[in-house]
């Protein structure tokens, strides 16, 4: 474990001093590159996304029957894109800043099965593991109708195996729900910030929920340790998993199709800005990778983190990645945005994606709660606090004169822009919990 000299670090990177002071800051990386240059650092390509997409299609008949809420989309787990013009007006008034272009919301908050962005990666990794086990056992071939997985023989087979994961909440929900449905024995190691209702829902499904008084990093480490001691246990590693990453990446081609259907153009003169809440980085990193593969250099991804948990901005800005945590510089990693309460970023995602991400911003809990209330009033859309992290993004981009000048985003180009706020969770929040969120504004 390296020792961090804070004085030296803040001298070299003055932005770190502002992070330590819990200020809301933004940083637009001057070292970003074109997709063709940055892609080699990811180590994955379009064929990997296609492989993931095809796997999800194979499982669609099973999902449509196992989870009736997915029947109307024929077993495809996808969310809608909605305009939020009233919220756009609220933001413009609140910050006295006109947002050029249109503002849209991507409602991963209301994805079927688990009500968060983690329904993409988490469910995909469980399905990938189940497919591998069943094919190796001679119970399944890729040409089969996967709805046969509903048969009792498959549940009996999967009962012989277990799955473990460490989570702040939403990933555990997705993996717990999916694993339990297939028949796996599943343990979810939950960090201190995980919401009680998420733990209760998992326990009601027969999931083994193990609680920790410490943060996300400890929960992940304990989950990993449990799996190491059991050859039948598969550990889903949110910090390093390429499978999770690819599950999220399929979102890119699907969003492109949604935009095509809506007649939304994305090109050099019509840029797309996407604002993604970031915890450890797997979800936003995978989605950003998929978006880059779908829209190329015309999509500009910006990660949003709580002021108390700015692990990705800290890791990328200093170049230390997962060798530094927010706790190393005296930040407590305690935030109302429980899904983003991560002190140490994924080294895999940071290194893979740093050249392809335009920028990073931090936002206070107070501002997230205020935005949550404003969105509820303006659009009647209810989200959990972490899902609002990116809502300030269009204001930050509009006010970032240096970034816009460097990228040659003049007023004409910005007038043609699409701003997409990625809402990451909230669709399954119980009414009484949502009421308490709204009271906090």
From Swiss-Prot:
Keywords: Lyase, Pyridoxal phosphate. Its cofactor is pyridoxal 5'-phosphate. It catalyses: D-serine = pyruvate + NH4(+). InterPro entries: D_Ser_am_lyase (IPR011780), Ser/Thr_Dehydratase (IPR050147), Ser/Thr_deHydtase_PyrdxlP-BS (IPR000634), TrpB-like_PALP (IPR001926), TrpB-like_PALP_sf (IPR036052). Its EC number is 4.3.1.18. GO terms for biological process: D-serine catabolic process; isoleucine biosynthetic process. Belongs to the serine/threonine dehydratase family. DsdA subfamily. This is Probable D-serine dehydratase. The lineage of its organism: Bacteria, Pseudomonadati, Pseudomonadota, Gammaproteobacteria, Vibrionales.
């Amino acid at each position: 474990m390296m020792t961090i000299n804070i004085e030296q670090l803040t001298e070299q990177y003055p932005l770190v001093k502002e992070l330590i002071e819990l200020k809301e800051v933004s940083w637009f990386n001057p070292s970003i590159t074109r997709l063709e240059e940055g892609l080699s650092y990811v180590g994955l390509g379009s064929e990997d996304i296609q492989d993931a997409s095809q796997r999800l299609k194979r499982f669609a008949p099973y999902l449509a029957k196992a989870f009736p809420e997915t029947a109307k989309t024929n077993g495809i787990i996808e969310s809608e894109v909605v305009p939020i013009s009233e919220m756009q007006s609220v933001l413009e008034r609140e910050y006295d800043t006109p947002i050029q272009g249109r503002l849209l919301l991507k409602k991963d908050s209301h994805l079927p099965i688990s009500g968060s962005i983690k329904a993409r990666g988490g469910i995909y990794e469980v399905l990938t593991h189940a497919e591998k086990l069943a094919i190796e056992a001679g119970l399944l071939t890729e040409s089969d109708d996967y709805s046969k997985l509903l048969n009792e023989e498959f549940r009996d087979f999967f009962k012989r195996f277990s799955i473990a994961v460490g989570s702040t909440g939403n990933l555990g929900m997705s993996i717990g729900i999916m694993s339990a449905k297939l028949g796996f024995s599943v343990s979810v190691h939950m960090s201190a910030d995980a919401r009680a209702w998420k733990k209760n829902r998992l326990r009601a499904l027969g999931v083994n929920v193990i609680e920790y008084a410490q943060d996300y990093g400890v929960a992940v480490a304990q989950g990993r340790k449990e799996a190491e001691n059991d050859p039948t246990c598969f550990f889903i590693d949110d910090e390093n998993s390429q499978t999770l990453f690819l599950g999220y990446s399929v979102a890119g081609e699907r969003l492109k199709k949604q935009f095509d259907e809506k007649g939304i153009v994305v090109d050099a003169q019509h840029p797309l800005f996407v604002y993604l809440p970031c915890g450890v980085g797997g979800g936003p990193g995978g989605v950003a990778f998929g978006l880059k593969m779908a829209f190329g250099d015309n999509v500009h991804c910006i990660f949003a983190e709580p002021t108390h948990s700015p692990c990705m901005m800290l890791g990328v800005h200093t170049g230390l990645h997962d060798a530094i945590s927010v706790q190393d510089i005296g930040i407590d990693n305690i935030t109302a945005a429980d899904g983003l309460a991560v002190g140490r970023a994924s080294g895999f995602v940071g290194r893979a994606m740093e050249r392809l991400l335009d920028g990073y911003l931090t936002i206070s809990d107070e501002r997230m709660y205020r935005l949550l209330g404003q969105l509820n009033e303006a659009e009647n859309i209810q989200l959990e606090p972490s899902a609002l992290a990116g809502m300030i993004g269009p204001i930050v981009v509009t006010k970032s004169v240096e970034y816009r000048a460097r990228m040659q985003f003049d007023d004409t180009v910005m007038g043609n822009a699409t701003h997409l706020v990625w809402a990451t969770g909230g669709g399954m929040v119980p009414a009484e919990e949502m009421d308490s969120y709204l009271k906090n504004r």
